[in-house]
C-alpha cells in the first residue's frame, strides 16, 4: 500500500543484518569464511527486487547500515551485491543512476 503513495520512497538495504537474536545463515559467526557478493545476491535478490518493482527505481535507493552491517558482510561485498542486483534486474543506465545516487540526492536535497 505504501508504494502507491507517490511521495513515498524506499531505502533498499538491511536485509542482510541480524534482527534481534535471529542471525542470518550467512552471518560471519556462522561461516568458515566471509560470504561473497554473488552468493549474497543469490540469497537476497528476491527481497531487493520486490521493493524495486513495487516502488520503481526512481523511488528506491540502495543503502547500507554500516557499521552495523559489518558483522554480517563487508562494505565492498554489500555494494558489489547491489551492483549484481541491478544487473540481474536488467536496470537501465538511468535506473541504475536512480538507485545508486539520484533518488538519494533528490530525497536529501543534495543537488
Map each language-model feature to its residues:
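Catalytic pocket-lining loop regions of alpha/beta-barrel enzymes
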Residues: 1-61, 106
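Active-site metal-binding loops of divalent metal-dependent hydrolases
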Residues: 65-66
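Short catalytic/ligand-binding loop motif for oxyanion handling, primarily in non-cytosolic enzymes
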Residues: 18-21, 69-73
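Mid-to-C-terminal alpha-helical segments outside catalytic/metal-binding sites
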Residues: 10, 46-50, 54-61, 70-111
Amino acid at each position: 500500500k505504501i508504494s502507491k503513495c507517490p511521495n513515498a520512497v524506499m531505502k533498499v538495504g538491511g536485509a542482510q543484518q541480524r534482527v534481534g537474536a535471529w542471525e542470518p545463515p550467512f552471518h560471519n559467526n556462522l561461516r568458515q569464511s566471509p560470504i561473497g557478493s554473488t552468493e549474497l545476491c543469490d540469497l537476497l535478490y528476491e527481497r531487493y527486487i520486490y521493493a524495486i518493482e513495487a516502488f520503481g527505481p526512481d523511488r528506491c535507493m540502495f543503502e547500507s547500515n554500516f557499521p552495523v552491517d559489518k558483522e554480517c558482510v563487508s562494505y565492498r561485498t554489500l555494494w558489489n551485491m547491489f551492483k549484481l542486483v541491478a544487473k540481474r534486474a536488467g536496470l537501465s543506465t538511468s535506473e541504475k543512476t536512480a538507485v545508486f545516487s539520484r533518488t538519494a540526492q533528490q530525497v536529501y536535497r543534495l543537488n
